[in-house]
């Protein structure tokens, strides 16, 4: 996949109508936005376009309205809060059809530097099917398309791919540019030693990632629920821990492949365990084996040190997926230890979206990382080496 895409700085935007696909899929509680990270992430691109005299038309999805208008998934609260953050009024166009009379009228009245926000693109069922009609309607509003929603770049939808069939100038905003720079460089030309830390519950979610990264990394670190499948494959006792029986052969294969390629394949050497899946006091095991009647819920202290040492010597570190059940206070220690090791390291540190990003932000290490990806599924597919349709649709 070509990572050298044209950006908003490569084109003339003054006086032009610019449709910007943002990621405003934010959590709402009683109409109030509870996490503003995605709004703040969109500001640099919007500010640049406003300051350079573009007519800025913003669009995004929120939640899963499944092609029907749902008032609780309206983008009205986003328009209100974004206006405050931008320090400039953003006109909201409340059309259930997204590109309706309100939107057309609002766009027709725009002056240079004005901003309009369209309604939730998933109010239209064609959006997720990349339907021609809705793509044309969106494209009819603008002369330039900017994609700045990395979180949906792995989806071929009307507002990410379809519009580019009808608008010739299609470029990326600052957010996607940053994702391509850090994730792209990490995957294509990483500074070595390159360490990948993979956690989370399931091996099956990370198969393609492990496959792709084994050709690039010096060390792979495995934590979270998926570690128990690898340990069982090597003949260790795992008690009642999570295991994917149908992935045991695959786990053996990966360990053999790592050995063949000279990649360090690190698995937990001790665990924090409990008798049931609850936030109860943890027992630390002596070694890799987990006693009968207990389940592993986090890596243990010896493993924390082993993993932290690997991170300390690295020049590039990518992390995707927690080391344990970090929602439980007794079992968040491994995740904290890895986050801290990355925060203290001099390496380029990249967090691959999703749960790891949430964990790092909750733990207060966010500003110590080089880059926190804004896309969970998108960054995973990127690490799998897949082409992301929302990015390949943009001008080289």
Swiss-Prot record:
GO terms for cellular component: cytosol. Its main location: cytoplasm. InterPro entries: Phosphoglycerate_kinase (IPR001576), Phosphoglycerate_kinase_CS (IPR015911), Phosphoglycerate_kinase_N (IPR015824), Phosphoglycerate_kinase_sf (IPR036043). It is an enzyme of class 2 (transferase). Gene3D superfamilies: Phosphoglycerate kinase, N-terminal domain. Substrate binds at residues 23-25, 38, 61-64, 122, 155. Its EC number is 2.7.2.3. GO terms for molecular function: ADP binding; ATP binding; phosphoglycerate kinase activity. Pfam families: PGK. One of its GO terms (biological process) is glycolytic process. PROSITE patterns: PGLYCERATE_KINASE (PS00111). It is found in: Cytoplasm. Keywords: ATP-binding, Cytoplasm, Glycolysis, Kinase, Nucleotide-binding, Transferase. Monomer. This is Phosphoglycerate kinase. It comes from Clostridium botulinum (strain Alaska E43 / Type E3). The lineage of its organism: Bacteria, Bacillati, Bacillota, Clostridia, Eubacteriales.
């Amino acid at each position: 996949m070509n990572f050298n895409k044209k950006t908003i700085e490569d084109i003339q935007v003054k006086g032009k109508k610019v449709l910007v696909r943002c990621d405003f899929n934010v959590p709402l509680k009683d109409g109030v936005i509870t996490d503003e990270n995605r709004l703040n992430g969109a500001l640099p691109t919007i500010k640049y376009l406003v300051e350079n005299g573009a007519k800025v038309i913003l669009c995004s999805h929120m939640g899963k309205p499944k092609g029907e208008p749902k008032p609780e998934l309206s983008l009205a609260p986003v328009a209100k809060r974004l206006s405050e953050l931008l320090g400039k009024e953003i006109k909201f166009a409340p059309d259930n059809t997204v590109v309706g009379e309100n939107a057309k009228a609002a766009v027709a009245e725009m002056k240079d530097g004005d901003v309009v926000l369209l309604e939730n693109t998933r109010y239209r069922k064609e959006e997720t099917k990349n339907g021609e009609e809705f793509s044309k309607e969106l494209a009819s509003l603008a002369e330039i398309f900017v994609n700045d929603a990395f979180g949906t770049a792995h989806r071929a939808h009307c507002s990410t791919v379809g519009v580019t069939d009808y608008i010739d100038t299609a470029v990326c905003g600052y957010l996607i540019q940053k994702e391509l720079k850090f994730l792209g460089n990490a995957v294509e030309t990483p500074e070595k030693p390159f360490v990948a830390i993979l956690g989370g519950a399931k091996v099956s979610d990370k198969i393609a990632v492990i496959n792709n990264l084994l050709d690039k990394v010096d060390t792979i670190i495995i934590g979270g629920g998926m570690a128990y499948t690898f340990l069982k494959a090597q003949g260790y006792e795992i008690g009642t821990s999570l295991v994917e029986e149908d992935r045991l052969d695959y786990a053996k294969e990966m360990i053999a492949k790592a050995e063949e390629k000279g990649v360090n394949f690190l698995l937990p050497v001790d665990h924090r365990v409990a008798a049931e899946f609850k936030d109860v006091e943890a027992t630390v095991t002596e070694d890799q084996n987990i006693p009968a009647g207990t389940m592993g819920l986090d890596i243990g202290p010896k493993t924390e040190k082993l993993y932290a040492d690997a991170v300390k010597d690295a020049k590039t570190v990518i992390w995707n997926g927690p080391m344990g059940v970090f929602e439980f206070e007794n079992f968040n220690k491994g995740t904290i230890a890895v986050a801290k090791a990355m925060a203290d390291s001099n390496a380029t540190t990249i967090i691959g979206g999703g749960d790891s990003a949430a964990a790092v932000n909750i733990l207060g290490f966010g500003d110590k990382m080089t880059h926190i990806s804004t896309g969970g599924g998108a960054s995973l597919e990127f690490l799998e080496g897949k082409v992301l349709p929302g990015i390949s649709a943009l001008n080289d």
